[in-house]
Amino acid sequence: MKLVIVESPAKAKTINKYLGDEFKVIASFGHIRDLPSKKGSVLPDKNFAMEYDISDKASKYVDAIVKYARKAEAVYLATDPDREGESISWHVAEVIKEKNKVESDDFFKRVAFNEITKKAIIHAVENPRKLDTNLVNAQQARRALDYLVGFTLSPLLWRKLPGCKSAGRVQSVALRLICDREDEIERFKAEEYWDISLKMQNSNNELFTAKLTHVNDQKLKKFSIINEKEAKDLTRKLKLQKFYVEKIEKKQQKRQPQPPFITSSLQQEAARKLGFSAKKTMQIAQKLYEGVDIGKETIGLITYMRTDGVTLSNDAIADIRKLIDKNYGNKYLPINPRIYQSKVKNAQEAHEAIRPTNITYTPDNLKQKLEKDYYKLYELIWQRTIACQMENVIMDLVIANLASENKEYLAKANGSIIAFDGFYKVYRESLDDEDEEDNKMLPPLKAQEHIKTKEVIPNKHFTEPPPRYSEASLVKKLEELGIGRPSTYASILSVLQDRKYVTLEKKRFIPEELGRLVTVFLVGFFKKYVEYDFTAGLENELDEIAAGKLEWKTSLNNFWSGFNNNIESVNEQKITEIINYLQKALDYHLFGENKESKVCPSCKTGQLSLKLGKFGAFLACSNYPECTFKKSIVSGNDNNEDEGNLSTILNDNKILGTDKDGVEIYLKTGPYGPYIQLGEQCGKVKPKRTPVPTNLKQSEITLEVALKLLSLPLKIGIHKDSGEEIIIGYSKFGPYIKYMCKFISVPKKYDFLNLNLDDAIKLIENNKAKLEKKHRSMV
């Protein structure tokens, strides 16, 4: 038996039917090993050793893989053809080697394919290769970088900015883009400007519109007419003028089709045309790639969907051209096939573009066989693929230059018409911020023809701020900057929303206050690591590792030495210094240009300043506790929700850190006082909670103290005489020792969290002596 291992059951089902009975196809269900979410999973001091664990979820799949591998004559690793897929295959091979004592690498065959079709699968199985260690190392380097940033920067954030959940190597840079754009919008000052339109009529009484372009031989610029008075003066003068056609220009314009889809362009176009999120687009594309049921069979309908290559195979181009000729006619078919070059920064071109695996499966053929959203995305991919090999669109353009009889004023009218629809026959690309007017034809005009001016219209405009990022435009910007890779865009956008750092309103990203705080903090104290060029440079290094041009641990060492020094430096910063910096950096956002807006509206003498608390960021008066005014700056929290004791709000819901499993530990305040909580409530399952001892101040509750409290009740040893367990615990009556079903109070003079066995036995014996003395006195 030959064992074939893929990532998903759907992919396994599709591949299984193409291979004979000698093959057994099973799924790993994604990654079987990963770095556990705890300290020490990557060890810089040990040459970046990485401690991988098999998750509880993956263990049953690993058992099946190991069992079948014992019976197999060879293992075919058929995971996705990218770094992530190579990494999954490597982990599978490593686990099989360890569990089954396999020593030879020849036992493993790496098979890679760009599409799940019978031809591609058979060819891959017949032509296996060895695992590409360069690709594996590139993925390990990326994972290590993300871990080192997350598990050193996030805890620092929890200490310095209570309420902030995490920071990531790439997500923080994407967040900065969104926040920087919001800063531009807030600081933007609209400027007034005017232009003049003229409604004209030709000799056949046909109307058209022209725009004033020159006055006294001076070309009008955007701000040539800056107020209503100037516009009205010009309007009055133009009404007295007679115009004629000075010159007619005619020319043709050709529009070329866009390249076939890559990951980013598919996400952008699906967002514009279909309203799909990047996450939804990738989920559907994954299913279309792995295989869907179309009635008589399950087939993979598209090629691999994580790619930055725009090339198409020669066979695919031949099939596309054949279909164009058959369905649309020879005039829509260029003489030569179109060959595209990627414009993506650092594109790898390792895979084909995203295309249908069989171009003869037209959308019409599949409309009744696919789910609605699956059909929409497949149709988009099919149309773009066909269009990319079709003829140009040809536009006939007409430009009429008009002049006043005294030559003092010039105007221009434009018109266009589609002379040949070319690839428009199948597909038209959308624009993210479309501002093009509909194409209009001009009526017939002749040179020297006199034109009547029917109306002169002054048009008032204001400059507009840059638009907020949509999913499509943010992905495009990340791609232009060389930040992230095709496989990461969707997850970056999802994480920012899941962390409540940004919201998506009317399909545009708006940063939340927490998101802005994190960004300002990182720009202030970790500026290098959220610079666009630096992050893109790391992506370049990962590409060099994948190409075998750079040793991966050298790259990690170069990054870590500087980053760790930065962490240690910021750790020494006082929280007051950080708050002061945040206050200064966010001053314009919070108060604008009006200094009076900083004055406390309650006491009239204090100054408002930034604070962080239970409900996010808010403003509080500097005269606290004499003045308890506060105002939430988080959307939706200007209500009684944040009323209460200000000192409580400042310390409530503080994240202390995480336990060994990566679960967050909170310091909270309830109706009965402060308490420690492990994790969030999940449905009806309440998280573990323990009260804070009354002799401890909230400022004394560190992560170490919280972990000790959560570990209670805890066995601290065995009594040397009786052999019975001694347990330390804490209840509403205070700390206690439990011994032989008896509860013994721990006096305040003892640090009960660090109580040793000898002291515990001493307390037990003292309690025993007291009881015996009491008993004798009663007798």
Curated annotation (Swiss-Prot):
Domain Topo IA-type catalytic: 132-568
Site (Interaction with DNA): 31, 142-143, 146, 158, 306, 499
Catalysed reactions, semicolon-separated: ATP-independent breakage of single-stranded DNA, followed by passage and rejoining
UniProt-listed InterPro entries: Topo_IA, Topo_IA_2, Topo_IA_AS, Topo_IA_cen, Topo_IA_cen_sub1, Topo_IA_cen_sub2, Topo_IA_cen_sub3, Topo_IA_core_domain
EC number in record: 5.6.2.1
GO molecular function: DNA binding; DNA topoisomerase type I (single strand cut, ATP-independent) activity; zinc ion binding
SUPFAM superfamilies for this protein: Prokaryotic type I DNA topoisomerase, Zinc beta-ribbon
Domain Toprim: 1-111
Active-site residues, as the UniProt record annotates them: 304 (o-(5'-phospho-dna)-tyrosine intermediate)
Cofactor entry: Mg(2+)
GO annotations of cellular component type: chromosome
CDD domains, sorted: TOP1Ac, TOPRIM_TopoIA_TopoI
Region described as Interaction with DNA: spans on this chain: 166-171
Gene3D superfamilies (UniProt xref): 3.40.50.140, Bacterial Topoisomerase I, domain 1 (3.30.65.10), Topoisomerase I, domain 2 (1.10.460.10), Topoisomerase I, domain 3 (2.70.20.10), Topoisomerase I, domain 4 (1.10.290.10)
Any single GO BP term: DNA topological change
Sorted UniProt keywords: DNA-binding, Isomerase, Magnesium, Metal-binding, Topoisomerase, Zinc, Zinc-finger
Zn finger (C4-type) start-end: 600-627
SMART domains documented for this protein: TOP1Ac (SM00437), TOP1Bc (SM00436), TOPRIM (SM00493)
Pfam families: Topoisom_bac, Toprim, Toprim_C_rpt, Zn_ribbon_Top1
Enzyme class: isomerase
Binding site for Mg(2+): 7, 80
Subunit structure, as described in the record: Monomer.
Similarity comment: Belongs to the type IA topoisomerase family.
Its biological purpose: Releases the supercoiling and torsional tension of DNA, which is introduced during the DNA replication and transcription, by transiently cleaving and rejoining one strand of the DNA duplex. Introduces a single-strand break via transesterification at a target site in duplex DNA. The scissile phosphodiester is attacked by the catalytic tyrosine of the enzyme, resulting in the formation of a DNA-(5'-phosphotyrosyl)-enzyme intermediate and the expulsion of a 3'-OH DNA strand. The free DNA strand then undergoes passage around the unbroken strand, thus removing DNA supercoils.
Protein name: DNA topoisomerase 1
Organism from which the protein derives: Rickettsia typhi (strain ATCC VR-144 / Wilmington)
